[in-house]
């Protein structure tokens, strides 16, 4: 499964242009982000096929990443750390779809390792797939504060000695 050839070529061209922009700016994205950007649509299509067979969406995504990036028939062997990071990037896509982007869960997700790369992936995907624009808008909106501010010393909530 996976995207049709025209969509796939548009995606790869956009990813390669983004790599050029980063290189010209002196930035070097992590290898996992590069792999996710190059092979993500194919892996997401494969994950959709696994999910259609009854596998939960998150597990289907992890299975698809492993099927594509750990295939022994590949001439290049991709380091396990890169595979795990790609799993994280694409797995966060699943979690982003299931959240409003404004909940306490979303606040925790924003602090997870790999979230920034997942957001970059989503931004590129939304430029190719208009259906993802609304999802991107949910996640780039400022997150509300959920009372995580530390208490100031001397506040009414501190324990005071009893007389």
What are these language model-derived features?
Residues 1-163:
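Catalytic cores of the polymerase beta-like nucleotidyltransferase superfamily
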């Amino acid at each position: 499964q996976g995207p049709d050839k025209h969509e796939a070529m548009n995606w790869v061209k956009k990813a390669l242009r983004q790599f050029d922009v980063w290189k010209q700016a002196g930035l070097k994205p992590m290898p996992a982000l590069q792999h996710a950007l190059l092979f993500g649509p194919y892996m997401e299509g494969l994950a959709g096929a696994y999910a259609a067979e009854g596998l939960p969406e998150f597990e289907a995504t992890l299975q698809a990443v492993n099927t594509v990036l750990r295939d022994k028939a590949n001439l290049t062997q991709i380091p396990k750390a890169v595979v795990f990071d790609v799993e994280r990037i694409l797995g966060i896509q699943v979690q982003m779809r299931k959240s409003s982007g404004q909940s306490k869960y979303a606040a925790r997700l924003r602090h997870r390792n790999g979230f920034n790369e997942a957001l970059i992936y989503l931004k590129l995907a939304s430029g190719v797939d208009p259906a993802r624009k609304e999802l991107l808008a949910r996640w780039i909106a400022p997150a509300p504060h959920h009372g995580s501010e530390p208490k100031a010393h001397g506040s009414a909530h501190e324990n005071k000695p009893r007389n």
